[in-house]
Amino acid sequence: MGAIVLVRHGQASFGADDYDRLSPLGEEQARLLGGWARDCGFNLGQVALGTARRHRQSAEQCLTAYGAGPASQDWIVDAGFDEFDHHEVMIRFRPDLAEPGALGHFLTQSDHPHRAFQQMFAAAVARWVGCAHDSDYRESWPAFRQRCRAGLGRLMATVDSAQDVWVFTSGGAITALLQSVLAIPDERIFELNWTLVNTGVTQLRYRPGRVSLSTLNSQAHLERQRRPELITYR
């Protein structure tokens, strides 16, 4: 039975003009993951990832620290592991935040900007997942969930069932894949999502016709550094 190791990307550049780029801390998180994987004897024999820059940068940093692994031209790139459109989900809930600079202005009005964003974004996601407004979105929650599951299905059909595959992806995709494994209802599923840390490791065991959860959101590679600032969620 092989393992599919789902890795949430390192910390991205939240609040910057280009979110889809690892922050210096995100790069460090990914390197720590690679060093930990090497020390623990994990096999990074096959790598898959979504199409986002932060996915590729996370894989690059991780494998550099690991010191081995497949060449980048041999990685499996599949849009099934891409994140949902955060911006669209947000502005369908808060159209006033669609204008350039509007989100930054919104955050400056709060003494606790990260908390204010999380509260607003959680409400936006609840609207999206609730499926009462599916026609408002280019990709509804059911469509996103099916896209992620199809990506996992393609991966399982491509690799040997005894082979381990490391998949560098995003929190939403991991959440969608775990929903079918754990049978969590829609209205509860993003309670899991909010707990997923950057470069957290979720391991699935798979064989033909069966996928089961082995490890959820492990952050041992960060915890062993005894630096709380390494634990991030965006």
Question: What label would you give each PLM region?
Answer:
Residues 2, 68, 83-112, 142, ...:
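Acidic, low-complexity terminal tails and accessory targeting/binding regions
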Residues 165-177:
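A short beta-strand-loop-alpha-helix capping motif that often carries His-Thr
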Residues 5, 76-78, 214:
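General small-molecule cofactor/ligand-binding pocket signal
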Residues 135-165:
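A mid-sequence, solvent-exposed acidic-amphipathic segment
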Residues 3-5, 10-65, 140-147:
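Loop-to-helix element that buttresses phosphate recognition and phosphoryl-transfer chemistry
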Residues 102-143:
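Short glycine/proline- and acidic residue-enriched helix-loop micro-motifs
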Residues 10, 171-172, 217:
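Active-site metal-binding loops of divalent metal-dependent hydrolases
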Residues 34-119:
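Phosphate-coordination/substrate-recognition cap region in phosphate-metabolizing enzymes
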